Amino acid sequence: MSDVSVPLTFSDVAAAKVKTLIAEEENPNLKLRVYITGGGCSGFQYGFTFDEEVNEGDMTLVNDGVTLVVDPMSLQYLIGGIVDYTEGLEGSRFFINNPNATTTCGCGASFSV
């Protein structure tokens, strides 16, 4: 996939954290899978998990040697978004800066469109 048509951004900070976590797990086949499910206080919620598989139709992005995977259904809600990572007083977490979200919950884990 060329950079011109990439509908989602995988930040350098998030990629660095994924790289660290993969090294800790000692499994170079792991990829960060981002997905959307129904639920949460705003209607949809973000999910993050490690996966060794890339399914047919999945979009992949590579940054700093690590791979982000998104299924087609989830991608439609994430177009134009940024997958990022933060560490602060509230803890550390992956999050998505999603321009499609019309409302988000206080913790940023769920949204509506």
Swiss-Prot record:
Cofactor binding notes: Binds 1 iron-sulfur cluster per subunit.
Molecular function per GO: 2 iron, 2 sulfur cluster binding; 4 iron, 4 sulfur cluster binding; iron ion binding
PROSITE patterns per UniProt: HESB (PS01152)
Keywords: Iron, Iron-sulfur, Metal-binding
Gene Ontology annotations for the cellular component aspect, listed alphabetically: cytosol
InterPro entries found in the cross-reference section: FeS_biogenesis, FeS_cluster_insertion, FeS_cluster_insertion_CS, FeS_cluster_insertion_RrpA, HesB-like_dom_sf
Annotated binding of iron-sulfur cluster, by residue: C41, C105, C107
GO BP annotations listed: iron-sulfur cluster assembly
Cofactor(s) this protein requires: iron-sulfur cluster
Subunit structure: Homodimer.
Xref: HAMAP family: Fe_S_insert_ErpA
Physiological role: Required for insertion of 4Fe-4S clusters for at least IspG.
Family recorded in the similarity comment: Belongs to the HesB/IscA family.
Protein name: Iron-sulfur cluster insertion protein ErpA
